[in-house]
Curated annotation (Swiss-Prot):
Functional summary from the UniProt entry: Has antibacterial activity against Gram-negative bacterium E.coli ATCC 11229. Shows hemagglutinating activity. Inhibits prolyl endopeptidase, but not trypsin, chymotrypsin, V8 protease and proteinase K. May have a role in mucosal defense against microbes by interacting directly with their membranes.
Molecular-function annotations in GO: endopeptidase inhibitor activity
Keyword Disulfide bond: yes
GO cellular component, one term: extracellular region
Subcellular location(s) of the protein: Secreted
Residues in the signal sequence: none
Primary location: secreted
Tissues expressed in: Skin.
The keyword tRNA-binding appears for this protein: no
Protein name: Proteinase inhibitor PSKP-1
Origin species: Phyllomedusa sauvagei
Gene3D superfamilies in alphabetical order: 3.30.60.30
PROSITE patterns registered for this protein in UniProt: KAZAL_1, KAZAL_2
């Protein structure tokens, strides 16, 4: 399990590159930044704890 490096994306637009990550919530995210945006925008406490399960699609 990998901690996403969300600090890299603070106040920036997500890059358009497709580099899928599989979250510990078993969802595939477009890239690490997209996962970080989801975590930041979510109001659910459980979502704040999502990590990267693996690089690539779930």
């Amino acid at each position: 399990v990998i901690e996403p490096k969300c600090y890299k994306y603070e106040g920036k637009k997500c890059p358009p590159d497709i580099n899928p990550v599989c979250g510990t919530d078993k969802r595939t995210y477009y890239n690490e930044c997209a996962l970080c945006v989801f975590i930041r925008q979510s109001t659910k406490k459980a979502d704040k704890a999502i990590k990267i399960k693996k690089w690539g699609k779930c």
